[in-house]
Amino acid sequence: MTGVSAQAADATTWLESTETTGNADRPDTIRDSSNDRNIILAALKGWQVAVGAGLELGGASPVPIPRSIRKINSFNPLLNLYLEGTAYKSFTPRWGMALGLRFETKGMKTNANVKNYHMAIIEDDGGHMEGGWNGPVITKYRATYITVPVLATYTFSNPRWMVSAGPYFSLMLNGDFDGYVHDGYIRTPDELGENVNVTHATYDFSNNLRKFQWGLQVGGSFHAYKHLYVNANLDWGLNGIFPSDFKTISFALYPIYGTLGFSYLF
């Protein structure tokens, strides 16, 4: 975390002072009474531990947007939260690493108009059809993950600022991807097939969601007040939320989320 090296230096000064003079006055960066000698010794070894929480904003998106998605009528990011614990290790006054364990939710709800959008639907009477859908499609995605980011950190000459970057690895605990279509038609069995008018039909691809995901995380932290830090990150998935052999949706959907939160450095 920002200022780890600076805190270690302050801790050294304080320990030397207490050993020689018995004066337990602490420097500003480690004055909090909850910090005991073990925490200070951990700082001397370059380790710090933080816990934090925050919000995630984003969605699962194709890159680039395909021609089959003609118009996005609405987008709802839903309420996505995260809780995280992070261990920080400094190697030099500037460079270090961060290893985290994050419990997070990701989701979105979209309403779009599409043309020849390949998918499989189930009509209200139970009939199953697959092909190119033309018309409105409403999608809701919601999943819970355990995520491990492994980051390199850099602290600026002003130790209140730090940036970080590195890979993350996520395991999905549970997830849903479903929705419905209405007032359109589907060309079946493919985009060149016969038109079939559809008033309302549903789809559910929850069982096809990928269990393991990975990507890149970049971000920064600001030391706002004593032990309180403000954090902002961008997580960009490098594999889609569906496995590559899932062809019902003909393009990959990458999880792309920005996070904003706070953490407390012990």
Model-based region annotation:
Residues A6-A87, L265:
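Short glycine/proline- and aromatic-enriched beta-strand/turn motifs that initiate or cap beta-hairpins
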Residues V51-L55, L81-K89, L101-F103, V148-Y154, ...:
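Residues on the lipid-exposed face of transmembrane beta-strands in outer-membrane beta-barrel proteins
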Residues L41, S250-A252, T259-F266:
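Ligand-binding grooves and catalytic loops that recognize ribose/phosphate and carbohydrate rings
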Residues G59-L78, K106-T144, M172-Q213, Q217, ...:
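Extracellular/periplasm-exposed beta-strand and loop segments of Gram-negative cell-envelope proteins
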Residues R94-M97, P159-W161, K226-A232:
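Repeated loop/turn-to-beta-strand initiation elements of outer-membrane beta-barrel proteins
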Residues L78-Y82, T92-G96, A143-T147, N158:
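Short connector loops at helix/strand junctions that flank enzyme active sites
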